[in-house]
Structures are given as structure tokens and as C-alpha cells.
A protein has these predicted regions:
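HAD-like aspartate-dependent phosphatase fold
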Residues: 1-232
């Protein structure tokens, strides 16, 4: 392990000569709770002026186009970045393609765990949301039942799912979310717990190296060492 001190970087201006492209997290870097973080517009404008492409990478269960619309509503214009990639976008295309062996016997009926709005982008793929876990072929997780949840609350639910050997798809790997200044468990924590007790879970998103490969392909850089990741 290296004992070298981590250098302090005071601003984007000190990075533009070192890196050719940037993969940037959204929550906590670009915005928090639908408000842009301080200095974001100036930083993105500087990268744009210097010809440094930016791809935003998020574990949101929403599709990339929906996140791009949210960014524009907050004042981040599409010209300032090259693209957006979300965990939800990757899951959407995995479900649509059905190439991964995980999907070979998935079935068409899912029990959705999370806010209803997060399921809407996937409804067009022909899967049916069922209200009862006994009818489901698999579990689709985008969130929790509520912000005051704890993992203990889900133990009976997990036991039923495991007894039926239901596979789980997690479209938001983040274990926690920050709301009103407090941390709450999120979809990723539920998926990790289900996997821990023996459940079969499929997920994509940070910090899985494959999602960075998608971003690098989109950036089309000749030297990957000159791509900076900002955020978690």
C-alpha cells in the first residue's frame, strides 16, 4: 500500500490539462435533492470550452433520457455533456435483449418493489406487474416501501421470495439515499441482503467495472489513463 499523500485539487482548472475526458457522478456532485451544487454550471462550461467531453454516470433506476430531462429542468443543457448512463438504462436493455443467462427462464410477471413511477419505463417491454408476490415470476427492485424502512422489516418478505426461489433484478444498486439530510436504506441494500441469504440477484451500476466500460466506449478516447472519474 502506498503512503503517498492524496493531492488536493482546488478546481477543474487544475485537471483540464491532465485529463482528456470525465465520467461524473450526479448525486452529490452535480445536484442534491433537485438543486444544482455550487459551481456546477461554471465547471461544466469550462470543460465544454476546453473540449473535454463529460459523461454522467448514475445508479438511478430511471432511463438515461429521463435523467437528461431532469438535468435540463435544473439548468444543465445537453450541449454541456456528451451523454448520460444510468443503471436503469442498462437494466432496460438487458431485459429487452434477454441475452444474459439470468433472463432465460425469467417469466413475464414481476412484483415491483419501489415507487410506481420507477416501473413505468419498463412497462412497455411486455412484463406484467402483479400485486401479490405469490403470482410473481421475479422481483424487480427500484426502491423501498418507505424512507423509515429497515432491513429487518423485509425479512419475512425475503423468506417468502427465497422459498419460491424467485430471482431479483435490482435497477438501483445504491445501498443508501440521502433525503432531507438523513440517510435511508435504498434498493441496493435490499438486493445485497437478498443475495446474502441465498437469493439470485441481477444488477448493474457503480461500482461494477462493466458500467465504466460502457462510458469509455461512449467517450472514444485513445488513452484510458487520461479519463478522470469524479464522484463515488
Amino acid at each position: 500500500m502506498s503512503n503517498a499523500a492524496v493531492p488536493f485539487v482546488s478546481g477543474i482548472r487544475n485537471l483540464v490539462s491532465v485529463y482528456d475526458a470525465f465520467i461524473v457522478d450526479l448525486w452529490g456532485v452535480i445536484y442534491e435533492e433537485q438543486h444544482l451544487c455550487y459551481g456546477v454550471f461554471n465547471a461544466l462550461s469550462q470543460l465544454y470550452d476546453e473540449g473535454k467531453p463529460v459523461i454522467f454516470l448514475s445508479n438511478s433506476p430511471l432511463r438515461s433520457s429521463d435523467v437528461a430531462k431532469n438535468l435540463e429542468r435544473m439548468g444543465v443543457k445537453p450541449r454541456l455533456y456528451k451523454g448520460v448512463l444510468t443503471a436503469g438504462e442498462i437494466i432496460y436493455h438487458e431485459l429487452k435483449a434477454g441475452i444474459d443467462p439470468f433472463f432465460s427462464n425469467l417469466g413475464r410477471k414481476c412484483f415491483h418493489l419501489g415507487p410506481e413511477c420507477f416501473w413505468q419505463p419498463y412497462a412497455q417491454l411486455g412484463y406484467v406487474c402483479v400485486p401479490n408476490i405469490d403470482e410473481a415470476d421475479f422481483i424487480f427492485v427500484t426502491g423501498t416501501f418507505g424512507t423509515q424502512d429497515s432491513l429487518d422489516k423485509y425479512e419475512p418478505f425475503f423468506k417468502v421470495c427465497l422459498s419460491r426461489r424467485l430471482p431479483m433484478i435490482c435497477a438501483c444498486p445504491d445501498p443508501f439515499i440521502l433525503q432531507n439530510g438523513a440517510l435511508h436504506i435504498a434498493a441496493g441494500a435490499l438486493a445485497a441482503q437478498y443475495q446474502k441469504i441465498g437469493g439470485n440477484v441481477f444488477w448493474r451500476g457503480k461500482p461494477d467495472p462493466s458500467v465504466y466500460e460502457y462510458c469509455l466506449e461512449g467517450l472514444d478516447v485513445s488513452d484510458r489513463r487520461r479519463v478522470a472519474g469524479i464522484g463515488e
